[in-house]
Curated annotation (Swiss-Prot):
Function: Removes the formyl group from the N-terminal Met of newly synthesized proteins. Requires at least a dipeptide for an efficient rate of reaction. N-terminal L-methionine is a prerequisite for activity but the enzyme has broad specificity at other positions.
Gene Ontology BP annotations: co-translational protein modification; translation
Cofactor: Fe(2+)
NCBIfam families: pept_deformyl, PRK00150.1-3
PANTHER family the record matches: PEPTIDE DEFORMYLASE
CDD domains registered for this protein in UniProt: Pep_deformylase (cd00487)
Transmembrane segments annotated in the record for this chain: none
The reaction(s) this protein catalyses: N-terminal N-formyl-L-methionyl-[peptide] + H2O = N-terminal L-methionyl-[peptide] + formate
Species annotation: Azotobacter vinelandii (strain DJ / ATCC BAA-1303)
Protein name as it appears in the record: Peptide deformylase
Domain of life where this protein originates: Bacteria
Co-factor binding comment: Binds 1 Fe(2+) ion.
GO MF term (any one): metal ion binding
SUPFAM superfamilies: Peptide deformylase
Amino acid sequence: MAILTILEFPDPRLRTIAKPIETVDDGIRRLIDDMFETMYAAPGIGLAATQVNVHKRLVVMDLSEDKNEPRVFINPEFEALTEELEPYQEGCLSVPGFYENVDRPQKVRIRALDRDGQPFELVAEGLLAVCIQHECDHLNGKLFVDYLSTLKRDRIRKKLEKQHRQHG
């Protein structure tokens, strides 16, 4: 297993639209393992392949306190099951150190493949619903900062660009 490099906003590669995974093979399972290792080391609760510069429709997630509930979503799709949007404070490993409220549906239906390529479906609420929407956004080249005002987004971009200049 290996810890992968996480791309940071405003890296243009984060805007790449991920391609569906055709076959779930050992290479994909190795990527899944590396993504979990990377996410746990960061530390984070979710990671999309786009964030590690692999443009495939793959998300890993673990919302548990003790990191013992790993979830894999291959080619995930979701649909909102409620029209009401609620604010939820979001952060992102690709936008380190920044947290902002984003309005999202609080209940969604998710369809995806598991690490063995088997299809599954689940209804998610609360943090899981928010997290899957956030990670699916990554697969579509979108970041949580895109939901913010231009002023807030530009302020975050400038601060991160300054950090990148200072730390290489």
